[in-house]
């Protein structure tokens, strides 16, 4: 299974008993999209939905995800690429489960996700959608690279390669691999920009010159 590699915020949503909670990869609760993405996920029914928050650009999504005021969620949506029933989600806390893997295959999980989405298409879902995928049988590297290049030309980061029959793994593993071209560049720093919100008074980002245009770099900065 080949899918585009998204450039957003990893988000795991749990829908249970009429409530929906969205979590970042770190486990931090994301509540700013409850009235948009959260309400639409409730229409899909109980389960665990895995995807990425997408929008105009990564920086703006990050700001809106944790902003406490002046919240603007317009244009932000959840691109889903996996699904787990609640009983399989509980396997993550089962100490007897070897490797903490689930029973449903990658393809079966995605088919269940598509079935839920198709049943609710008449509900006009605007903030939740499934990613596009391509299934290749015994692909060569050239086959995968062709799809990778297509995704990159459409603005994606690269390609995700998934084992058709693999169970869901809680954590990193070889069931899912990524293909991404590495690019580096030496750029002149033209300025320093202050952080916003709780990072006010600290370095927020570097301003650098790229092909004569000033851009900001600093997503990897820490306190």
Describe the function of each predicted region:
Residues 1-125:
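Covalent nucleotidyltransferase
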Residues 85-88, 152, 194:
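Hydrophobic/aromatic-lined pockets within catalytic cores
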Residues 53-55, 80-85, 132-134, 163-165, ...:
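Short, structured patches in soluble enzyme cores that scaffold and shape functional sites
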Residues 3, 9-51, 168-223:
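Classical nucleotidyltransferase
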Residues 130-183:
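Amphipathic alpha-helical
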Residues 72-73, 152-153, 200:
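Extracellular/periplasmic catalytic domains that process cell-envelope and extracellular macromolecules
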Residues 46, 123-128, 156, 213-215:
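Short aromatic/hydrophobic-glycine micro-motifs
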């Amino acid at each position: 299974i080949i899918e585009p590699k998204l450039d957003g915020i990893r988000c795991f949503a749990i829908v249970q008993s009429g409530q929906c909670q969205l979590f970042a990869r770190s486990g931090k609760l994301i509540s700013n999209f409850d009235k948009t993405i959260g309400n639409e996920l409730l229409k899909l029914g109980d389960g665990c939905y895995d995807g990425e928050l997408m929008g105009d650009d990564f920086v703006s999504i990050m700001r809106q995800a944790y902003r406490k005021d002046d919240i603007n969620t317009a244009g932000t949506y959840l691109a889903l690429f996996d699904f787990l029933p609640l009983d399989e989600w509980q396997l993550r806390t089962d100490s007897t489960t070897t490797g903490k893997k689930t029973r449903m295959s990658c393809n079966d999980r995605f088919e269940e996700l598509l079935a839920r989405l198709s049943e609710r298409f008449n509900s006009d879902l605007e903030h939740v959608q499934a990613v596009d995928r391509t299934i290749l049988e015994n692909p060569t590297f050239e086959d995968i690279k062709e799809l990778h290049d297509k995704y990159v030309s459409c603005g994606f980061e690269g390609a995700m390669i998934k084992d058709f029959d693999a169970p869901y793994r809680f954590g990193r593993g070889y069931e899912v691999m990524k293909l991404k071209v590495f690019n580096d560049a030496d750029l002149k720093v033209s300025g320093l920009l202050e952080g916003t919100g709780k990072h006010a008074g600290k370095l927020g980002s570097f301003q650098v010159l790229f092909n004569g245009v000033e851009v900001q770099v600093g997503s990897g900065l820490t306190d």
